[in-house]
Structures are given as structure tokens and as C-alpha cells.
Design a protein with these regions (language model features):
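Cytosolic regulatory regions of ion transport systems
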Residues: 1-215
């Protein structure tokens, strides 16, 4: 369990809070808006109304005691930059900030953010990849080059063993697991025959995965 300082309770911040609560973490939530703070109270450990760009207020939170500080402020980039800088100056261990553009991302990284999330761009990329192919069911980028895909097994692969396909050597594609009725089966080997009633999780270079499954 981690202690999380979450600043900004717009739609993104509220969704982050809900997931953190589901995962069992301790959450201190902060927003200027009293209504937002009151609405989030049932799913967080504590919540305060305040201006995170005010250093006096921020000091009262004990920034250095949190494992992660998440700056989820939307539509007020000046406050986001100020908050990010102050958090780092006050000894925050890990600052994760939200950006809405590439320019904002670069600015946040220069001003104290350890990591930056770009939810609109990430969701746009996921949507474009997911719905431009009949075979791709889910997509998780790992870095700028590699991704996990959940894909339907191509008809030409059905009935063949993983070893016979040899896609790791020929295409750099690693078949990591099969998935049937929502359950993962990671007990696979070169001798595993690919059936027609499940999907598979594959790992590889994003461009190669798109070439193999994106049509």
C-alpha cells in the first residue's frame, strides 16, 4: 500500500482516485473546489480544500511523507507548473504530472516532474489502434518501441504450434499467453497448438505488431 497525494479533482483526478481506492492505497485528495472535495470524500483517506500553488498551504500537507504526488490539474497550466515545482522543492519523492500537449509535457519535465502522463493523447492512440483493426482487442504501450497487444488468433495460425510458427525469430513477436473466457493461460510452450476459440497476448515492437495484426 502506498500513500498518494492527489492534486486536482476534475474528471481525470476523480478517475485516478477511484482506481487508487480500488487498489487499496491511502489517498490525500486536494482541490480548490469545495463541491469536488466533498464528493470525493467517500473514496479517499482524507481530502482538503486549498490552492496547491500556495506554498504555505502545500507545506501543511507534509509533501515529503507521500510515496507519490500526482498533479492532475486540468485547464490551469500555470497552477500545474507552480504546483509541480513546489512539490519538488519541498522534497516530494516522485512527482507525476498531467499534460494536455507536447509543449506542456516538456515544460513539466523541466520544472520538476519526474514523469508526465498525457491521457488525451494516450487514449487517442489506443482508440486509433484498437478500432482500426478487426484483430486487435487491446493495446498497452511499454515504451516508444514495444507494446503488449491482445489479438484474435489469425485464421492462418489456428491449428499450428507456437514452435512451428516461429514468429519470435521471423517477426520478433513473443506469444506470452492465451486468453479464454476472460482467463489467462500462461502455461504455454513451443508445442502449444493455437486454437480458434481464444485470443492471445503478444509482445513485440509496436510497428511489427501492427504489420502482423493491424489489417
Amino acid at each position: 500500500m502506498k500513500s498518494i497525494l492527489l492534486i486536482g479533482l476534475g474528471r481525470f483526478g476523480q478517475n485516478v482516485a477511484a482506481k487508487l481506492n480500488e487498489l487499496g492505497h491511502e489517498i490525500m485528495a486536494v482541490d480548490r473546489n469545495e463541491e469536488r472535495v466533498e464528493s470525493i470524500l467517500p473514496i479517499v483517506t482524507n481530502a482538503q480544500i486549498g490552492d496547491s500553488s500556495n506554498p504555505d498551504f502545500l507545506r501543511t500537507l507534509g509533501v515529503g511523507n507521500f510515496d507519490v504526488c500526482i498533479v492532475a490539474i486540468a485547464h490551469d497550466f500555470h497552477s500545474s507548473i507552480e504546483t509541480t515545482t513546489l512539490l519538488k522543492d519541498m522534497g516530494a519523492k516522485l512527482v507525476v504530472a498531467r499534460a494536455e500537449s507536447d509543449v506542456q509535457q516538456r515544460s513539466l519535465l523541466r520544472n520538476g516532474a519526474d514523469q508526465v502522463v498525457f491521457p488525451e493523447a494516450q487514449m487517442a492512440r489506443w482508440t486509433a489502434i484498437r478500432y482500426s483493426s478487426e484483430h486487435i482487442l487491446d493495446y498497452i504501450p511499454l515504451d516508444n518501441q514495444y507494446s503488449f497487444f491482445e489479438v484474435k488468433i489469425p485464421a492462418r495460425w489456428v491449428g499450428k504450434t507456437i514452435g512451428a510458427l516461429d514468429v519470435r525469430r521471423t517477426n520478433g513477436i513473443n506469444i506470452m499467453a492465451l486468453k479464454r473466457n476472460g482467463r489467462l493461460d500462461m502455461n504455454i510452450s513451443a508445442a502449444t497448438v493455437l486454437p480458434d476459440d481464444c485470443t492471445m497476448l503478444v509482445l513485440g515492437k509496436t510497428n511489427e505488431l501492427l504489420r502482423s495484426f493491424g489489417n
